Regions:
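Feature captures hydrophobic
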Residues: 1-104
Length: 104
């Protein structure tokens, strides 16, 4: 199963960010992931980084979304995702996660 560093590499290699915008995933004790469309980079060492949207989700549920096993809208409606900031940007979440496919 992919860890945070592997996910960061996969997302970076697939340009999984929204140009000009910053989306931060807060995985709680599992860390953070910043999709930095300003710097055109994906990093995981920036817990305090500013973001246009912050999405709180468990790392396990994030991986399920990236594998296509969990729909972002469904996860939000079930309370598995909490969003702060630009809600419109968060609505693009499915298009971002569709740029990657995790195995296992």
């Amino acid at each position: 199963m992919a860890d945070l560093n592997e996910v960061t590499q996969i997302m970076g290699a697939n340009n999984a960010f929204v140009p000009g915008k910053r989306i931060k995933f807060d995985f709680g004790t599992d860390g953070t992931l910043l999709l930095d469309g300003v710097a055109e980079a994906v990093t995981n060492d920036n817990a305090e980084a500013d973001a246009d949207t912050t999405i709180k989700i468990s790392f396990d549920n994030f991986k399920k979304m990236a594998k296509g096993d969990l729909n972002a809208t469904t996860a939000f409606m079930m309370g598995k995702i909490k969003i702060s900031g630009d809600m419109g940007l968060a609505m693009q979440l499915q298009s971002v996660t569709s740029k990657i496919k995790l195995n296992g």
